[in-house]
A protein has these predicted regions:
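Bacterial N-terminal signal peptides
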Residues: 15-30
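Extracellular carbohydrate-recognition regions
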Residues: 34-57, 139-147
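Short carbohydrate-recognition loop motifs
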Residues: 62-84
Length: 250
């Protein structure tokens, strides 16, 4: 009898350990595949997506609406001498292996010049904001970031990587933002890509991270947010684009 009790206890212990292991694996899998909510749901912006401007911003906010374009539910980005980001917060979530979306240009911004402050606008961009540890940020930029955080009262990301629809810039060009090196942009589309046509994108996030910020951290840090945006506050013109189907993948 004692042996039987011992066997039963051992089996129960094994089952409990297995159940705990399966639960942990399920939680880790769920975290690894955490997704931003769909950009569009039931004819409106998806739950959790919010429009955010700059502290003390004087320019109007970029307008984000919903449209059906060629049968696709899409977000309409209209920038008119405006600034504003469509943000989905993902604090502490692991970065995805792949980032996918579709976009099309309707009215390009021919005044864009991503290398200069006066041309630093985009008719469409998709970004990931990363929670890079401050000790990885170069000293001078770290001090500027700390000051900006204290002035704004917001936890501004230490690293943001954007994939941008530019103008005259070459495809795959990598550029630091002219206002802050805490933002790097990779140009995917430009004036040679025809308006009124959908383009499907798929990016290797780790490869693009290493290319952009690899000198600061070879390891991809956790996310802070996913961002879809358009702005025209520097160029003062109007642009229109659509973005659809933003999703993470292996």
């Amino acid at each position: 009898m004692p042996g039987s009790v011992t066997e039963v206890s051992a089996r129960r212990c094994a089952v409990a350990v297995l159940a705990a292991a399966l639960l942990v694996a399920a939680l880790l899998t769920a975290a690894a595949h955490a997704q931003p909510a769909p950009l569009v749901a039931e004819g409106s912006l998806g739950a959790g997506w919010r429009v955010a401007g700059l502290p003390g911003q004087k320019a109007p906010l970029t307008r984000y609406g919903v449209a059906q374009v060629d049968g696709r539910p899409a977000v309409r980005l209209e920038a008119a001498a405006s600034y504003g980001n469509l943000v989905f917060d993902l604090p502490g979530q692991p970065a995805p292996q792949r980032l996918r979306w579709s976009w099309r240009m309707e009215r390009p911004n021919a005044a864009v010049d991503l290398a200069r402050k006066e041309g630093d606008d985009a008719a469409a961009k998709v970004c990931l904001a990363f929670d890079l540890p401050l000790d990885r940020v170069p000293f001078f930029e770290r001090q500027l970031l700390r000051f900006a955080r204290s002035q704004s009262g917001e936890n501004l990301p230490a690293a943001t990587l954007c994939w941008v629809w530019g103008h005259a810039e070459a495809r795959e060009a990598l550029l630091p933002n002219p206002y802050s090196r805490r933002v790097r942009v990779i140009v995917l589309r430009n004036k040679e890509d025809a308006p009124g046509r959908w383009f499907d994108e798929e990016r290797d996030v780790a490869a693009d991270w290493r290319r952009s910020f690899g000198d600061e951290s070879a390891q991809v840090p956790p996310l802070q947010a996913a961002i879809v945006a358009a702005d025209a506050d520097n160029t003062g013109v109007t642009s229109v684009a659509h973005v659809a189907g933003l999703r993470f993948g292996p």
